[in-house]
């Protein structure tokens, strides 16, 4: 009887320690709560932007008197536009204005290009952080012919189309490379009583840097 009583007393004394150990084991066995994952905000191409470009043009001027002349040279200017975005489709309007130093002579006839600009639609596909795009619209340029006796300068209107790749360098800085084909059609020039018919096509590669608002 005394032995049974001693066992009861010892068991009662150990009970708090057993409960504490069980509780500690239960706490340790609970899986850790995962930390919340912060999702970075999706970049949007929507909004206004502006920038500068530098390029090189390969031109072909067909004339009715001396045949083809190829006045190739550098060009530079500025561009600005506005994008809209729906899911991954990016679309908008863009304009550019610049100057071409293209000038070349053949058999006494010189063809010289000057101011040039365009107003175009643009549509691209968001592959964040890059966007391939297509563009097309109207174009204009000042083109001068000189045969040594007389010269005439005319502002020519035509069309332009091309494709490019734009890249997000930072949240606000954009980089791009673009190919453009432009055709200014046929125009007659009166040079000292001689009518010279001219057609000018240009192909150029441009690289640019822009700022997105």
Swiss-Prot record:
Keywords: Cell outer membrane, Membrane, Signal, Transmembrane, Transmembrane beta strand. GO terms for cellular component: cell outer membrane. Residues 1-23 form the signal peptide. It is found in: Cell outer membrane. Its main location: membrane. Belongs to the Omp25/RopB family. This is 25 kDa outer-membrane immunogenic protein. It comes from Brucella abortus biovar 1 (strain 9-941).
